[in-house]
Amino acid sequence: PQSTGLPPIEKYRNDYPKNYSEKSEQELTTKEIFFKYVLNNKILWYIAFANAFVYLVRYGVLDWAPTYLKDIKGYDIKDVGWAYSAYEWAAIPGTIICGWLSDKVFKGRRAITTMIYMALVAVFVVIYWKNMDSVLLDNISLIAIGFLIYGPVMLIGVQALDLAPKKAAGTAAGLTGFFGYFFGTAILANIAMGSIVQH
């Protein structure tokens, strides 16, 4: 780390990003990081807000799929386990492909990839919710949701890093993560969904 006297990693590897300037190496005060690069960054706030809804779907499915499949759709516990596992395993190729699409096809424009993935998530959530006859369609929908939801989880964090200078990257990522975990998971996926289920 530079704090121990080492040079910046870009200089050490002679691998500078396109938008690099010596200015990015200057030390920033906590106030500058927080107010100039995080609190006043409207796009960062938009993606933090969007992250709450990404996490609503992620943890809504993660927390409620076993109960929904067993109690509403009539799965036995063994089939619930397989469906739930498939949802999680589908995340691995989905996240890798999402990153590749974002970098190679859309040239680093993270929002486009995220919007495509989330539109497809919405389609498969509706299919998963409305389908009452086909176990195969339930499983395909759950796998598709797992494949598609983890890409935006990853890309929102990456986009937060893209939107802030290197010295403010942790704070920017922390803001989006806070919105995801606190508002998306704790408030919406757990408290709000639990209240809806009970009433």
What are the language-model segments listed below?
Residues A119-D133:
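C-terminal ends and interior cores of transmembrane alpha-helices
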Residues K166-Q198:
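A late C-terminal transmembrane helix in Major Facilitator Superfamily
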Residues Y37, N41-C98, V153, G157, ...:
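Extracytoplasmic gate region of multi-pass secondary transporters
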Residues D103-M118:
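Cytoplasmic membrane-interface "Motif A"-like loop-to-helix N-cap segments
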Residues I96-K107, V197:
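Helix-to-loop junctions at the C-terminal end of transmembrane segments
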Residues Y150-P165:
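Intracellular juxtamembrane helix-capping segments at the cytosolic ends
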